[in-house]
Each structure stands twice: as C-alpha cells, then as structure tokens.
C-alpha cells in the first residue's frame, strides 16, 4: 500500500485511551480509534481531548487510523 492510498481527514480527539490510543470524532460524523505517529511520539507532542488533529485512514479498515498532525487551536 502506498501513501497515495491513504485517506486523510480532520477530527477532534474525544477520549484518551491507554497505550497512546485515542478515540477521534471525524468531521463527517464517524468515530475512529487512532494511535499517534512516530514523529509525534519522537518529538513529545502532547495530544489531549478536545484537540483538532489530522488522521490517516487506510481504505481497508476505516475504523482505525494514525494521528499525523495536531492542528493549531483557533482563538
């Protein structure tokens, strides 16, 4: 599977789960279970409930994803 096959969507983190897993509510109304990518883990970027994030999904399983970016909060 190549990077072109990935589906990238935005959503809001609803819940923090054990083992760096998060429940994310996507903008289209679906809920996914997402883990954080290696770059976010390596750079110690904190993800908290309420944060806006970008999530990559595979076309094979649309219920699981990877958080690739934490969006800036609009104030």
UniProtKB/Swiss-Prot annotation:
The keyword RNA-binding applies. SMART domains: S1. It is found in: Cytoplasm. The keyword rRNA-binding applies. Residues 1-72 form the S1-like domain. Keywords: Cytoplasm, Initiation factor, Protein biosynthesis, RNA-binding, rRNA-binding. GO terms for molecular function: ribosome binding; rRNA binding; translation initiation factor activity. It comes from the Bacteria. Component of the 30S ribosomal translation pre-initiation complex which assembles on the 30S ribosome in the order IF-2 and IF-3, IF-1 and N-formylmethionyl-tRNA(fMet); mRNA recruitment can occur at any time during PIC assembly. This is Translation initiation factor IF-1. It comes from Synechocystis sp. (strain ATCC 27184 / PCC 6803 / Kazusa).
